[in-house]
Amino acid sequence: MRRLVALLACCTSAAAADLRLGIIGTDTSHVIDFTKLLNDGSSPEHVPGARVVAAFKGGSKDLPDSYKRVDKFADELRTSWKVEFVPDIRSLCPKVDGVMLESVDGRQHLEQVKQALACGKPIWIDKPLASSLEDARAIERAAKGRSPWFSASSLRYGKDVDAVKFPNISGVVAWGAGPLGREPLDLTYYAIHVVELLYAVMGPGCEEVTRTHTDNSDVIVGKWKGGRTGEVRAIRPDSDYGALVFRDGGKVAISPNIDDGYRPLVEEIVKFFQTKRPPVPNEETLEVMEFMNAAQRSLSLGGTPVKLR
């Protein structure tokens, strides 16, 4: 009997130690996928250490991907996962230890980050970091010295990505789905996943970008310091994901998939909330935005090479 009591006490203590997370924006399927991984302790895919306990619904009235889904996902969080809903972002602050900004509309991110900073808690920002480079830089300025933040695509943690981070890479060709979104940065809608895959392998250091466009694809070629090159092929209407990594003496192909599961990403998100240290440096995340901004400028100039800075 004493063993049972001790075991129950141990389990209760472990559950009590879970970080409490609050969601901003319930207009993406990520809010359901992430909550299942965090809150379902009986699942073999369970990620321990944090739980979603509260949410602010949010939503964008002029974006179909938002207004067609925001209520549906909010209802599922409320009924299936007993997540408490609050009327505004400020009301999340006393209820949570960390904030997950999930709003599908990147145009909202800067203003929502500014409000979330009042909580003084770490902030996870789902892709894209922002809808423009200017907003991304404004997020960095606003958060500096106040709250740590982290943003990434799940493809950074896809199958075999870590295995090809060779020290002698000369170039990478990455490809995947490339439906285009709205300007100012149309790559932030979906092709950002391929850009993130490229950066996961290449690392930062891109200096110049050239972009060409056809009806069924965009090709963006970046020149890195030291003469390395990285290429993104954003394919429409859809594509699997992959990368060909060139190194001294040969090449290696990998096939990560965005549908492989979000568990590796969610594990990194929980570690971030625990340590308050982003696994992807903020400087690299901002360079991803600079890469897409330079690609947009190159496109507007008819494919002329554009410097990142």
Model-inferred region functions:
Residues 17-119, 141, 204, 224, ...:
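N-terminal glycine-/serine-/threonine-rich beta1-alpha1-beta2 phosphate-ribose binding loop
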Residues 3-13:
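Sec-dependent N-terminal signal peptides
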Residues 99-100, 272-309:
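C-terminal helix-rich "cap/oligomerization" subdomain common to oxidoreductases
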Residues 129-184:
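A contiguous active-site-proximal alpha/beta segment in oxidoreductase catalytic domains
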Residues 239-277:
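Interdomain hinge/lid region at the active-site interface
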Residues 172-240, 283-286, 290:
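Rossmann-like dinucleotide-binding domain that binds NAD(P)(H)
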Residues 120-122, 127-128:
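Short helix/strand-capping hinge loops at secondary-structure junctions
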